[in-house]
Amino acid sequence: MKVITTRLNNGLTIATQKILESESVTTGLWIKSGSRNEAAAEHGLAHMLEHMAFKGTKKRTARDIAQEIEDVGGEINASTSVEITGYFSHILPNDTDLAIEILSDIICNPVFDSQELEKEKHVVLQEIGSNNDSPSDIVFDHFMAVAFKEQAIGRPILGTEQSLQTFQPKDFKNFMAKHYYGENMVFAGVGAVDHDKFVKSVENYLGDLPKQQEKHQNKPAKYIGGRIIDPRELMDAQIVMGFEGCTYLKPHFYTAQLLSLILGGGMSSRLFQNIREKLGLCYSIYAFHWGFSDNGIFGISASTNKEGLEKLIKTIIEEIKLLTNNISENELKRAVAQYKAAIIMSHESSAARAPTIARQLLTYGEILPNKEIFKRIDNITITDLKKLSEKIFFNSKPSIAAVGPVENLLSTEELSNLLAQ
């Protein structure tokens, strides 16, 4: 199923993928702008903007936006990440133009009413409160904050109570003027979609979108590392430990993905088998690798009780050291199969394909066919895995964040010493 792209005169890229058996369409607008594009005084603005876009336009109230889509059985939503914001809808084919028009309206004509803003601040404050009350969520905020200290990429996407209170309507207009322009966007449609009709519809509503504003380059993300604890009276401690990873723009990204699968991807992984199954030290444990445009983070997440915390961390470090010395062909083969299957399975629905297409175009400027990604994965060797594991685990200061009964958590110096032994 081929992805067809068209670029409008204003730089906006339109991409469609027709799925013959599909009876619906996922369409949306994705912008290469997220929380890391915020200045310090704008912390949380990208996410709040996503909320405010649905709070009314020059021709629609917030209720109108929701009702017009739901009157035809559709859905509309949005999401904000570190580097990309998306506004999207899932509708029946005959309502594709309606969805495109509404999505275009909330991007081009938001009113940012001051009363609606004050109400939405309270909504997002509850979202922040819910996140802060969840140890398994807040520990990741702490982890990113210590890994990328005092940088936008390390700040929580939701913002804080203090930062939200300062926002005014003009702040959203200024942020959109900087980042919401044609060359910084992709409008994608996947499912029962006709490319020519889709392009005509998008051009009709977004053809006058500005082509390019003054480009604002993000400061390169600099990995720092360190330790942060959040003592709470809980039964279990939630921890995330990690190291500097790889940008998704470099070939090593795929090697890092395989490393995370071998170490802690699934029930057959080393961490799960050796730490949970054999030793019973925790209920949940897994490894992950997140790539960004100029950096990445490799991490391990786990939970255990107060008595088992130190042993858990020391055992994780032992598993890391073993990984750099011995990786079997069977482990590599299994990780490759897992990664390929995950990619294929993630493309089974139009709701998953549309953002994937948009992100690839915003990230790489092209669509990476599965066979090209699989070729890169198949070319990874055990030697590649060992070399990268040494670079990741022994060339950067560890980061560790913990929530719960964690007052006696090992320091980063102690972690580094254990790794060096």
Residue ranges and their predicted role:
Residues 1-3, 9, 17:
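Short, low-structural-confidence N-terminal segments
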Residues 11, 18-69, 180, 241, ...:
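Active/ligand-binding-proximal structured segments within catalytic/core domains
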Residues 16-18, 287-288:
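Short amphipathic beta-strand and strand-loop transition segments with alternating hydrophobic
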Residues 223:
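DNA target-recognition domains and sequence-specific DNA-contacting regions of bacterial/archaeal
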Residues 226:
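Flexible, small-/acidic-enriched active-site or ligand-binding loops
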Residues 268:
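Functionally critical, cavity-lining and gating residues within the transmembrane helices
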